[in-house]
């Protein structure tokens, strides 16, 4: 229905963003992994590559950072037993390049670790993923990179990203500060956020 939507990122919450385009606000489902990358672009112009899932009572828009990820999602949900929620969960867990590596290595265990994917489904998926995923990698370069503004500090970006996912500011500041202490000075936001979330989860499991 739409190839992409270009507009202002006006709102984010876990699993959802709103893009304003020509006076309309498009509610779009997206992976939390990508939403964390977008935190520094709130109230700025972005491009979202979209896929529409038509249901009996509604049309649901899913958004992706590249055409490659969108085509991967399209391929995933074509498999029996893999719906949009599970397809998005796979892309939330693995970047497209990582998913290609998993397919090449036939790492069924890694794929089966995704919520909603059991061992049998992972084994069935692996055959087609290994064959088809490499064709999508060139499309993965078609992203919204050219619309990114100059970055503020990773600390500020990280706090904004966690706040967008519902963490209180005080908790977000603590999580980012703890993660930064474990990484080199030149660590990127993409490296900091997974460490912050992992350490926070470990702390919750201990309590």
Curated annotation (Swiss-Prot):
SUPFAM superfamilies: DNA helicase RuvA subunit, C-terminal domain (SSF46929), Nucleic acid-binding proteins (SSF50249), RuvA domain 2-like (SSF47781). Residues 145-155 are annotated as: Flexible linker. One of its GO terms (cellular component) is cytoplasm. Keywords: Cytoplasm, DNA damage, DNA recombination, DNA repair, DNA-binding. CDD domains: UBA_RuvA_C (cd14332). GO terms for molecular function: ATP binding; four-way junction DNA binding; four-way junction helicase activity. Residues 155-207 are annotated as: Domain III. It is found in: Cytoplasm. GO terms for biological process: DNA recombination; DNA repair. Residues 1-65 are annotated as: Domain I. Residues 66-144 are annotated as: Domain II. InterPro entries: DNA_helicase_Holl-junc_RuvA_I, Hlx-hairpin-Hlx_DNA-bd_motif, NA-bd_OB-fold, RuvA, RuvA_2-like, RuvA_C, RuvA_C_sf. Homotetramer. Forms an RuvA(8)-RuvB(12)-Holliday junction (HJ) complex. HJ DNA is sandwiched between 2 RuvA tetramers; dsDNA enters through RuvA and exits via RuvB. An RuvB hexamer assembles on each DNA strand where it exits the tetramer. Each RuvB hexamer is contacted by two RuvA subunits (via domain III) on 2 adjacent RuvB subunits; this complex drives branch migration. In the full resolvosome a probable DNA-RuvA(4)-RuvB(12)-RuvC(2) complex forms which resolves the HJ. Belongs to the RuvA family. HAMAP family: DNA_HJ_migration_RuvA (MF_00031). Has three domains with a flexible linker between the domains II and III and assumes an 'L' shape. Domain III is highly mobile and contacts RuvB. The RuvA-RuvB-RuvC complex processes Holliday junction (HJ) DNA during genetic recombination and DNA repair, while the RuvA-RuvB complex plays an important role in the rescue of blocked DNA replication forks via replication fork reversal (RFR). RuvA specifically binds to HJ cruciform DNA, conferring on it an open structure. The RuvB hexamer acts as an ATP-dependent pump, pulling dsDNA into and through the RuvAB complex. HJ branch migration allows RuvC to scan DNA until it finds its consensus sequence, where it cleaves and resolves the cruciform DNA. This is Holliday junction branch migration complex subunit RuvA.
């Amino acid at each position: 229905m739409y190839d992409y939507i270009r507009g202002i990122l006006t709102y984010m919450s876990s699993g959802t963003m709103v893009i304003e385009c020509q006076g309309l606000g498009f509610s779009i489902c997206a992976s939390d992994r990508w939403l964390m990358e977008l935190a520094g672009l709130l109230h700025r112009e972005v491009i979202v590559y979209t896929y529409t899932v038509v249901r009996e009572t509604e049309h649901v828009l899913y958004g992706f950072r590249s055409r490659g990820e969108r085509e991967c999602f399209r391929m995933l949900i074509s498999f029996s037993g893999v719906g949009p929620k599970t397809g998005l969960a796979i892309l939330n867990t693995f970047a497209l390049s990582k998913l290609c590596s998993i397919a090449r290595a036939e790492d069924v265990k890694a794929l089966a670790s995704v919520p909603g994917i059991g061992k049998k489904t992972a084994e069935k998926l692996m055959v087609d993923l290994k064959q088809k995923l490499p064709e999508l990698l060139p499309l993965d370069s078609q992203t919204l990179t050219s619309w990114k503004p100059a970055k503020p500090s990773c600390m500020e970006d990280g706090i904004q990203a966690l706040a967008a996912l519902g963490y209180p500011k005080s908790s977000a500041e603590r999580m980012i500060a703890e993660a930064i202490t474990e990484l080199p000075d030149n660590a990127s936001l993409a490296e900091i956020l997974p460490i912050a979330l992992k350490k926070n989860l470990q702390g919750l499991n201990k309590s």
